[in-house]
Amino acid sequence: MYYSELVKKACAILYDAHRDDVDKGGYPYVFHPFYLATQMEGEDAVCTALLHDVLEDHGDRYSLDALARAGFPEAVLRALRLLTHAEGVPYMDYVRALAQDPIARRVKLADLRHNTDVRRLNGARPKKYDLYLQAIRYLEEV
């Protein structure tokens, strides 16, 4: 994992946004983005992994503009924009769009693999399990 002042800033935002959130397995949600970040190379990818759900889950408190003002570079902002699944957009259209950005693609692939790991979810499959597997196959092929 890459360590820098920007990564520290991303960690602080991640923790502030998700500190009270719990994942479907009952674990603190912050474990999930930290796990994804350990699989990334380079500052931009690590920051993107750490922040990948902040806008989608806590858009009432965080925005791309606020993250830009905080000093995150365009590569991170672009990937986060693509990783934020807009309401009403079919899931595979969303996946096809984000696949064009190498950082967004790597983060989403790690995210999907972690979200389909039933060991971390107390043996339960997510509702969208089959769709997630379809997205994994697509992202592995592009």
Feature names for model-found ranges:
Residues 1-142:
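Active-site helical microenvironments for divalent-metal-assisted chemistry
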